[in-house]
Swiss-Prot record:
Residues 66-91 are annotated as: Disordered. This is RNA-binding protein Hfq. The gene is hfq. One of its GO terms (cellular component) is cytosol. Residues 71-91 have a biased composition (Polar residues).
Length: 91
């Protein structure tokens, strides 16, 4: 199962390290906002005005509010660019 964590852990760790504000969408449609304070195999601790422990199995999507660098385990780094879709909601 460790191979399945090879993308998730560096992504969440970079969000935590750089204090990137995120929107977390749950499978029931609820949107949570804050910064990733900590995480483990099963939960993400999200901090805003209060800290919330969010179970990963309840998460649909994690959306960073700005671009950030994700460090690679091979010594390099890659840039995650949060795309803003100006047409979202317009129909």
């Amino acid at each position: 199962m460790a191979k399945g964590q090879s993308l998730q852990d560096p992504f969440l760790n970079a969000l935590r390290r750089e204090r990137v504000p995120v929107s977390i969408y749950l499978v029931n449609g609820i949107k949570l906002q804050g910064q990733v304070e900590s995480f483990d195999q099963f939960v993400i601790l999200l901090k805003n005005t209060v800290s919330q422990m969010v179970y990963k199995h309840a998460i649909s999507t994690v959306v960073p509010s700005r671009p950030f660098n994700v460090g690679s385990h091979q010594g390099g780094s890659s840039n995650y660019n949060a795309q803003q879709d100006d047409s979202a909601g317009e129909q």
